[in-house]
Amino acid sequence: MIKDPLGAVKSTFAEEVNRVLRDLGSATRFSPIQVSRVRKDYASYGLPVGFKVAKDLNLDPERAAKTVLDRIDMSRIAYSSDAYAESGYLNLRIDKARFFRDILKLASSEELGRGERKGVVGMVEHTSANPVHPLHVGSGRNAVIGDSFSRILNFLGWDVRRHYLVNDCNLQVAILAAGRSKVRDLIPKGKVDHWFGLIYAISNAFLEIWRIKNGFNSESKIEEWSEVVERIGRMEPELLRIGELSEEEVMSLLREYQRKEGGSVQMFREITESVLRGFVETLERMGITYDSFDRESELIWDGWVDRAIEKLESSGYLKREGKAAYVDLWEAAKGDENVRKVFELSEDDISKLEREGKLGEVIPRKFYLTRSDGTWLYTGTDVAYSLYKFDGLGVSFCYNVIASEQNMEQKGVRACLALMGHDPGKLIHLSYEMVNLVGAAMSGRRGLYITLDEVLDEAKRRVEAILKERGIYDEEICEKVAIGALKYGLISVSPNKVVQFRWERVLNLEENSGPFIQYAYTRALNIIKKAQGVPEDFDPNELKSDAEITIVQMISEFPERVWSAFNLMRPDIIASYANELASQFNKFYEDHPVLSAARPEERAARLNLVNAVKGTLGLAMDLIGIPRLERM
């Protein structure tokens, strides 16, 4: 059975029209995306054939459409019944009964739109938060987007590996390690990532105070950082023992660890593994898991950074300033077509920008990979990681889910990948904006943030209060509704827009929320349970009201929405679809008795419709990671 009946209608209709146009000598071609439903006719789909080919055929639009119609072979078009020309359009009428039956059967079995396995392995790298403080709500958005996009790819037929890059070799971890080295005797309290977050914040504050005193930081005042020290000191007085940290103290630890020397290895690993355990606990609570945690340190120790440097040196665009290595992206863009593609510029564009003195606004000239002391920057290890993904793991493509503030750095990484001989188009930046938790200010360096754990706990408390008001309380239900609410709140906005996170919207049980969708799914499930089964045999022609037909049409569009979410890198499209379908189903249920339908034939058809809604909503929920509930 075709797993996307509507897609089959559109593609075969466009293909057949194109075949006829070739025979008629017209160069005009149509794509499936141009096939649209004829207004007020649920069973007809049209193409503006007459208007597009009138000039080619030297006919008026009406006559051109009829000329094409006369040559159409209906047997080549999926689900076709007949066709007709009207007002310059060529319209296809489908076999409603067969089309509706297949749609409902596929949706009920949760096979609608599911892709055949492609035998192609891809990767989605997401979350990859620095292991220095607890995950905050912005990291949560990254995780939810990355997890959902992985699910979409898998549903469409790709074999997807979910990876997390553990950034254990950066300056932030070195600051945390320097602070921890002063209080090695202290045993972590509470959730371990929260505890290390306090050490990081106070250690960073002590370092900033040292920088100000020694003339390395003129933008901050000692009082600002002293307030951070005092605030955290009131929470954990023992951490005041850390005291001032110097730049050299921190950088010495970082150099040691990157070189795998001294006692730093054990301490860095203890810290990062501990924080990572806290991350995993939070993310698994949200139903988010990974296939691999790749460590930045091992990219250095196992030689991947050296391989990357060798390849970049071979390209001729790697330059050095003492121990600092960088790629000259201006020269690379002038000399390498694939680098120009990364920045979406032609040779003429680059020449023009250079003449106008504006090239630096579009391409940073020096893309540094190491610091002046030779330690690796995150850009250097990111370049090495990209090489490892393709040469080490052998993936065919990789999506990096990284915040929009890293747009230029990601272009630099992709440009380096091109210079190392790989297609930069295979490394895709899935960019997203941040989360504004209305009424809260956040700064990890100052220890001011709303953790993902806190948001989850608050969501659960609020759900408990709402459900208790309704005379319902169940621990598992509260947890799953809270998770659904949070995840929908983070994913229902297009990645290129800032999320304005408001509790009143996130927990709205009436519309446009995770709980609203969960409730609609549970309602459909319970109808099926009460019916004690769904009749295998039913007459699709019994579904004739506008509400019933609208639902079938919406269900038929599910595969199209999934492909749109993939092509546009927008999981929010599926979230919006789930909300629309839930809303339409609720309207249907208000006016259409199912279990008490007037006739057995009507009851059978409506039960199949409800079962299809359940299956489609369930698939949509799975793709955006919202838990299914059997009761609510």
Curated annotation (Swiss-Prot):
Catalytic function, reaction form:
tRNA(Arg) + L-arginine + ATP = L-arginyl-tRNA(Arg) + AMP + diphosphate
GO molecular function term, any single one? arginine-tRNA ligase activity
Top class in the EC scheme: ligase
This protein's superkingdom? Archaea
- Cytoplasm: present as a keyword of the record? yes
Primary location group: cytoplasm
**Gene Ontology terms: cellular component:** cytoplasm
Which keywords fit this entry according to its UniProt record? Aminoacyl-tRNA synthetase, ATP-binding, Cytoplasm, Ligase, Nucleotide-binding, Protein biosynthesis
State the EC number(s). 6.1.1.19
Where along the sequence does the record place the motif called 'HIGH' region?
Answer: 129-139
Which SMART domains does this one have? DALR_1
Compartment(s) = Cytoplasm
Q: What Pfam family is a match for this entry? A: DALR_1
Q: Which InterPro entries match?
A: Arg-tRNA-ligase, Arg-tRNA-synth_N_sf, ArgRS_core, DALR_anticod-bd, Rossmann-like_a/b/a_fold, tRNAsynth_Ia_anticodon-bd
Q: Which family does it belong to?
A: Belongs to the class-I aminoacyl-tRNA synthetase family.
Q: What is this protein called?
A: Arginine--tRNA ligase
Protein's organism: Korarchaeum cryptofilum (strain OPF8)
Give me the gene this protein comes from: argS
